[in-house]
Amino acid sequence: TFKLKKGELLTVLGPSGCGKTTLLNITAGFLRPTSGKITLGGNEINGPGVERGMVFQQGALFEWLTVAQNVNFGLRMKKVDQKTTEKKVEEWLEIVGLKGFGNTPTYQLSGGMQQRVALARCLINDPELILMDEPLGALDALTREKMQSLVLKIWKETGKTIILIT
């Protein structure tokens, strides 16, 4: 049992196979707990929801789309108007250090850049809780350090609640 307050950053560490990703998948609503329940804001989690955003170990991007098309995917599904979408995409690409890459196909990006696209795609939807499943695991040491700093910066500036599996 654990409680996470709004605006906290929880890092879950442990060896392979100990259940870190299972915990995250239950929190995301992808799996159901075998016993007990999990709640967010007093509401039981029974499936995926827009109040939770997920960043996977591998970017899970649509490689046939551009960076901007990947980032704005959720807003397009919500039918947010194009002008608002374009403005938000520009803002988040600048925050994650990808200003000027909006028209670049994601398959042309390095692993670290792809993870920043995935992070922007999650954050642009303004989720209450951000779930990160080993987003730094496939990155080289220098890129990992930069990505850690970026996640901390975003956490401090936005006050988002984050669960980070590593």
Regions found by a protein language model. Name each.
Residues 28:
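Helix-to-loop junction immediately C-terminal to a conserved catalytic motif
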Residues 13-15:
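The feature captures the beta-strand-to-loop junction immediately N-terminal to the Walker
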Residues 72, 76, 83-101, 152-153:
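Conserved ABC ATPase "signature" region
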Residues 104-107, 125:
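Conserved signature/switch motifs of ABC ATPase nucleotide-binding domains
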Residues 65-72:
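Short coil-to-helix segment of the ABC ATPase nucleotide-binding domain corresponding to the Q-loop/switch region
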Residues 130-133:
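Catalytic Walker B motif of ABC-type/P-loop ATPase nucleotide-binding domains
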Residues 36-47:
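Conserved ABC transporter NBD signature motif
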